[in-house]
Amino acid sequence: MSDRISIIGGGSWGTAIAYLLAINGKKVLMYVRDNNQKDSINKKRVNNKYFPDHQLPEGIEATTDIKEVVSFSNIVFLAVPTHATRAVMKKINHLLNEEQILVSTAKGIEEVNFLRNSQIIKEYCNNKIAVLSGPTHAEEVIDGLPTAVVVASRDKEVAESIQDIMMSSTFRVYTNPDVVGVEMGGAVKNIIAVAAGIADGLGYGDNTMAALITRGLHEMSRLGVHFGGKLLTFAGLAGMGDLVVTCTSNHSRNRRFGIKVGKGMNTEEALSSVNQVVEGVRTTRAVYDWYQGKKLNFELPITSQIYQVLFNDKNPLDAVNELMLRGPKHEIEEVVDDVNW
């Protein structure tokens, strides 16, 4: 078990992870890009950009030297958005030693190559990789509210080592070998959360939200299983758990973005208004572009309509109408096949 932890990324989630680990007695070094942010953390014990009202433990220090943070420990958390992962790996791949574990925390899919975060990381190193996911709003983690997550790795010892350093009375960590399922759940749920926000913005009710979450889970699991994920993973924290919290919480950037679109803003206006990374926008485009022209045994109707709303200025009301008037379907084909109905 390591007593020193490196975190690349000084955003809300990187700060929450640092806070949690420091409370657990670890020495944490965070890489941030801004000198003012570094000085605020080191001198005032506050991340002035993301958590100005939260005092950080003494065990946390910040640096703008990425070499320093990579060499600080044998466990390196990558707390950056998916679209920044490749650039970070280009900077650090030659600094890594073979003993270091990389922990991916992003929930997205790279647009051009349709790669999960762990796949991007693997292009640059042979290090062991873990993926952290689940229903986690940084604001609640740093407030000490009970939270449960999942850490996935193909190496059981790696998963358990991350579980060991993060577990606390307010933060419960489960392990799972299904890296594909955990990453796909974390990424694709953002699309459904945008849809949920749009539904809220249009003034729809609880029935609509329940339908979106349930049929959204269907899309998530179908897509994830297609790429090799395990179906039951989508019933867990990285699937249903993350989907529920992201579709219903006011902390959710994807939901807040969707609400603004539902109330009439276009994509650029809504992104500017949220003023934070909204992974669901890029993920919608990545999944839709991959999906086009493929002959598959499943459909992605919600994803397809959200793409049209975000990138082709389709009226959200028309998108809802088309979803509701799709041809009749069985709810779950496997059940029909199983009973020979």
Swiss-Prot record:
| Top EC class of this enzyme | oxidoreductase
Give the EC number(s) under which this enzyme is classified. 1.1.1.94
- Pfam families reported for this sequence: NAD_Gly3P_dh_C, NAD_Gly3P_dh_N
Enumerate the UniProt keywords alphabetically. Cytoplasm, Lipid biosynthesis, Lipid metabolism, NAD, NADP, Nucleotide-binding, Oxidoreductase, Phospholipid biosynthesis, Phospholipid metabolism
Name the major location: cytoplasm
The residues that the entry says bind NADPH are S12, W13, R33, K107, A138, R253, V277, E279
Does the record's keyword annotation contain Oxidoreductase? yes
Q: Which reaction does it catalyse?
A: sn-glycerol 3-phosphate + NAD(+) = dihydroxyacetone phosphate + NADH + H(+); sn-glycerol 3-phosphate + NADP(+) = dihydroxyacetone phosphate + NADPH + H(+)
Q: Per UniProt, what is one GO molecular function of this protein?
A: glycerol-3-phosphate dehydrogenase [NAD(P)+] activity
GO BP: any one term: glycerol-3-phosphate biosynthetic process
Localization, UniProt: Cytoplasm
Active site annotation, chain numbering? K189
Record-listed sn-glycerol 3-phosphate binding positions: K107, G134, T136, K189, D242, S252, R253, N254
Lineage top rank: taxon: Bacteria
Q: In which pathway does it act?
A: Membrane lipid metabolism; glycerophospholipid metabolism
Gene3D superfamilies, per database record: N-(1-d-carboxylethyl)-l-norvaline Dehydrogenase, domain 2, NAD(P)-binding Rossmann-like Domain
Q: Which PANTHER family match?
A: GLYCEROL-3-PHOSPHATE DEHYDROGENASE, GLYCEROL-3-PHOSPHATE DEHYDROGENASE [NAD(+)] 2, CHLOROPLASTIC
Provide the protein name: Glycerol-3-phosphate dehydrogenase [NAD(P)+]
Origin species: Halothermothrix orenii (strain H 168 / OCM 544 / DSM 9562)
